[in-house]
């Protein structure tokens, strides 16, 4: 069993499943639902479904949403400490999901912006660290998270980064993000993100460019599976066939499947398949978390 520290964010997802094309400036028929979310929190919750343990470092506001988010983490068995230490409201993400299951997100980081180094637990017993890119892209939490990464490196814990969407990354200079990638033992991206950071429209060239910065590069290819390269060794696996309902949280669930298996086995194929299997479960339902039942 592996124990993973997940650093970054927890939020409320407000999901609008569109029943028609958006009628700008007018009403659009949709189905609205709310779900707990946040990249780091999603990864932590999915990790608990792999017979591994997770501890979340994030913040919520002292508000009804915050109480509900903490209660939900407890139901999944995600460890945490002092999440409710911010004067800001809890984070919220509004998500539009089209008829193909693709999502467009409108994030408000909320209380997660107030992360501090003191939020870290003792590192004893941890096997690895996952860092949400949102926590680094937000200038208000960036310094604290970089200090957390420094401490994890001193403790010789493997660190994995998902830098988040290309749209979010464009708020920070690419050169700065590449410096963060160079601090990592591994980076997990989708096709678009890899081409953006890797500086090439050829995905394999982009992957090779990124591996000059970090020993492990994992690229999620959606319906075409996933690929990875580690110290020059390449592997690719197909996606697990499923009925796609909502892709929200697909990358988070993939990370939760991949990282513990990689730490256990060091086998690229096994780890990619573990990530793909968990992602298939995620996209078959609405929301970014596994069902509690």
Segments and roles (model prediction):
Residues 1-59, 64-68, 75, 244-245:
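Glycine-rich phosphate/adenosyl-contacting loop at the front of the ribokinase-like
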Residues 12, 16, 62, 165, ...:
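Short, glycine/acidic-enriched loop or turn micro-motifs at the edges of active sites
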Residues 43-44, 69, 148, 278:
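Aromatic/hydrophobic pocket-lining residues that form π-stacking "cages" and hydrophobic walls in ligand
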Residues 1-10, 71-85, 98-235:
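Ribokinase/PfkB-type carbohydrate-kinase core domain
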Residues 27, 31-38, 64, 89, ...:
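Residues at secondary-structure transition points
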